[in-house]
C-alpha cells in the first residue's frame, strides 16, 4: 500500500528509514464528518449536503500534508452483511438507517480517494475495522509504524509499541495519538486487550 509523492515538499522523503502506514477507517470518518456539521450543514450550489465529503477530505489532506505517510490506505465497510451476521443474526439490528446524505457522499469520497491514487480496502463480509486490524498487525511485523485513523475507541485494543490510534482533531483541538501508555491511562486499565 503505497502513496505516491504528493506536493513539492523536499522533506517528504527525508526520513525513509521510518515506514509510516496510515490506515483510515473510511466509514467512521465519514459519519464523524457528517455529524460534525449537523447543525450547520455544508450545502453546495446544487443543493447537495457536502459535509461528509468536506470533513473527510480535510482529514485526509491534513494527514498527507502534516504526517507525510510513506504508505496509506482507506478501508470501507463492504455492502451487505458481515461474517458476524452468521453467528449473531441480530448484529447491528438496532442501528438507525444510514442518513441519505451519507449514502450520497460515498461515491464522491471513493472518487476522491482514487484521485489521490490511494488504495481502497473493502473485503466482502469483513468490516473496515477487521481489515485495518489485520493490516496493522501485518505491517507491524514488516517494520512499519502504523496509525489507525479513526474516532472509534474499539481500535484501542490493537494498540502496541508500533501501532497507534490516530484520532483526527475536532473543532481545532488538535490530533490525539494514542499509544499503549495513553490507552491504559485513558481507560484506567492494565492491558490494551481489556478495551472491549
Language model segments and positions:
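Low-complexity, intrinsically disordered segments with a bias for serine/threonine
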Residues: 12-14
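Compositionally biased low-complexity segments enriched in histidine and/or tyrosine
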Residues: 1-2
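Extended two-metal-dependent nuclease catalytic cores across DNA- and RNA-processing enzymes
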Residues: 17-18, 39-43, 93-196
Amino acid at each position: 500500500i503505497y502513496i505516491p509523492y504528493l506536493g513539492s515538499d523536499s522533506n517528504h522523503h527525508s526520513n525513509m528509514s521510518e515506514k509510516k502506514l496510515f490506515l483510515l477507517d473510511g466509514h467512521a470518518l465519514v459519519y464523524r464528518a457528517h455529524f460534525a456539521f449537523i447543525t450547520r450543514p455544508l450545502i453546495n450550489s446544487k443543493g447537495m449536503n457536502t459535509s461528509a465529503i468536506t470533513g473527510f477530505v480535510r482529514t485526509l489532506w491534513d494527514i498527507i500534508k502534516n504526517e507525510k505517510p510513506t504508505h496509506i490506505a482507506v478501508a470501507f465497510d463492504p455492502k451487505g452483511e458481515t461474517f458476524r451476521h452468521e453467528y449473531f443474526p441480530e448484529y447491528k439490528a438496532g442501528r438507525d438507517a444510514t442518513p441519505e446524505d451519507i449514502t450520497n457522499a460515498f461515491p464522491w469520497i471513493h472518487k476522491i480517494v482514487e484521485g489521490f491514487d490511494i488504495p481502497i480496502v473493502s473485503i466482502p463480509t469483513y468490516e473496515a475495522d477487521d481489515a485495518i486490524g489485520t493490516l496493522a498487525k501485518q505491517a507491524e511485523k514488516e517494520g512499519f509504524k502504523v496509525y489507525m485513523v479513526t474516532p472509534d475507541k474499539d481500535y484501542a485494543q490493537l494498540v502496541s509499541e508500533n501501532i497507534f490510534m490516530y484520532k483526527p482533531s475536532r473543532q481545532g483541538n488538535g490530533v490525539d495519538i494514542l499509544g499503549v501508555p495513553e490507552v491504559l491511562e485513558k481507560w484506567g486499565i492494565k492491558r490494551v486487550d481489556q478495551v472491549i
